């Protein structure tokens, strides 16, 4: 498919989300986190990833969803950003899928606030919607601070 784009997909609550596969460094199970005092609520802590310090951003908190049920540990989608690696904490990892760019739709005008800032667009896939995250804004701790103020 010459006009397709690949996305790494994952679930956060009932939301089926994706981000550009070229930004994804790796996907991992739960890693130990160190809390960061005075950090925005979406920043769950710091992770030592083989000597590299990585900020962990909880997508449930970032998207205004309820906390994970007790005992449910998040998975890590480690992404490369211009400022270094960031881990997005998600509930479940999906697949790498390729979608036709012609099927891409911008978010509806009725989508407002933080969701509008983080969702780049939508694909309709076999009865479900794949929401594409703006990887730069989603992984930015500065955006997390601006959106809560």
What are these regions (language model features)?
Residues 1-149:
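An acidic, low-aromatic, low-complexity terminal/linker signal
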């Amino acid at each position: 498919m010459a006009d397709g784009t690949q996305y790494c997909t994952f679930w956060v609550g009932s939301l089926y989300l994706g981000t550009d596969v070229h930004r994804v460094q790796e996907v991992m199970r739960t890693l130990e986190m160190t809390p960061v005092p005075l950090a925005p609520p979406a920043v769950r802590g710091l992770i030592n990833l083989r000597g590299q310090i990585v900020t962990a951003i909880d997508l449930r908190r970032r998207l205004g969803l309820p906390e994970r049920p007790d005992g449910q540990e998040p998975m890590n989608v480690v992404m490369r950003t211009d400022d270094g690696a960031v881990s997005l904490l998600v509930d479940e990892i999906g697949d790498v899928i390729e979608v036709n760019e012609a099927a891409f739709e911008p978010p509806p005008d009725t989508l407002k606030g933080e969701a509008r800032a983080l969702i780049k667009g939508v694909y309709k896939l076999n009865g479900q919607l794949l929401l594409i995250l703006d990887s730069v804004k989603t992984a930015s701790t500065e955006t997390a601070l601006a959106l809560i103020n």
